[in-house]
Amino acid sequence: MKSTPFFYPEAIVLAYLYDNEGIATYDLYKKVNAEFPMSTATFYDAKKFLIQEGFVKERQERGEKRLYLTEKGKLFAISLKTAIETYKQIKKR
């Protein structure tokens, strides 16, 4: 499966996390995959990159790994979210 060619998977994951902070990792994957199909490997690689680059933090809570944006991630996600929402509207037409 391919992600949309317009955005890198990291951008999509970051934008979706903006509206779903504290979500379990696999639950975020399901949300992202519903609109932007990607393999689990692609999703987890994107998540790993975002953590390494300091955009996302992962915490173990209630027996699950949960994801949170850092301040850097929040600032970047705001602009990505707008662009991705616009792209989704264009695709619907």
Swiss-Prot record:
GO terms for molecular function: DNA binding. Pfam families: F-93_WHD. InterPro entries: F-93_WHD, WH-like_DNA-bd_sf, WH_DNA-bd_sf. Keywords: DNA-binding, Transcription, Transcription regulation. Disulfide bonds: none annotated. Homodimer. Probable transcription factor that recognizes a (pseudo-)palindromic DNA target sequence. This is Protein F-93. The lineage of its organism: Viruses, Viruses incertae sedis, Fuselloviridae, Alphafusellovirus.
